[in-house]
Amino acid sequence: MKTVFVLNGPNLNALGKREPGIYGGKTLAAIADDCKQAGASLGLGIDFRQSNHEGDLVDWIQEAGDKAAGIVINPGAYSHTSIAIHDAIRSIAPLPVAEVHLSNIHARESFRHVSMVAPVAVGMICGFGPLGYTLALQALAARL
């Protein structure tokens, strides 16, 4: 069975409490359950992780280069600032990476409109709330 790493960045551990008007009321644990169910239906193993620390995300991306068939990543605010995450994803190419955001980053503050991850991802899904994770897994499964 192929494994997909589902990586989550800063503040996503606070889902369900943090700005539910923007991010919804679903917790990250519930999203993890959704991903595991979607993965099972797609024949994929899911390794679901979250960290508030950029270096952890870089380490996990590099680990995925050796252990995973693809990555779904919600880098949170690091999407807009992290050259380190961009470079880590570039270093594991051609491993497919799908970027996910719960909110539509293009309909929010202008500083959120630019993603450092998008140029090295196979695609981005944003604005569909937690469903975006399932959509990203379906898209990756179609590529694997």
Curated annotation (Swiss-Prot):
UniProt-annotated binding residues for substrate: N74, H80, D87, L102, S103, R112
Catalytic activity: 3-dehydroquinate = 3-dehydroshikimate + H2O
UniProt site (Transition state stabilizer): R18
One family name in Pfam for this protein: DHquinase_II
Xref: InterPro entries: DHquinase_II (IPR001874), DHquinase_II_CS (IPR018509), DHquinase_II_sf (IPR036441)
Record-level GO BP terms: amino acid biosynthetic process; aromatic amino acid family biosynthetic process; chorismate biosynthetic process; quinate catabolic process
Top-level EC class: lyase
Residues of the active site: Y23 (proton acceptor), H101 (proton donor)
GO MF terms held by the record: 3-dehydroquinate dehydratase activity
Highest taxon of the lineage: Bacteria
Listed pathway(s): Metabolic intermediate biosynthesis; chorismate biosynthesis; chorismate from D-erythrose 4-phosphate and phosphoenolpyruvate: step 3/7
Annotated keywords: Amino-acid biosynthesis, Aromatic amino acid biosynthesis, Lyase
Documented EC number(s): 4.2.1.10
CDD domains, alphabetized: DHQase_II (cd00466)
UniProt family annotation: Belongs to the type-II 3-dehydroquinase family.
Subunit description: Homododecamer.
Function comment: Catalyzes a trans-dehydration via an enolate intermediate.
Xref: PANTHER family: CATABOLIC 3-DEHYDROQUINASE
Protein name per Swiss-Prot or TrEMBL: 3-dehydroquinate dehydratase
Organism: Mesorhizobium japonicum (strain LMG 29417 / CECT 9101 / MAFF 303099) (Mesorhizobium loti (strain MAFF 303099))
Name of encoding gene: aroQ
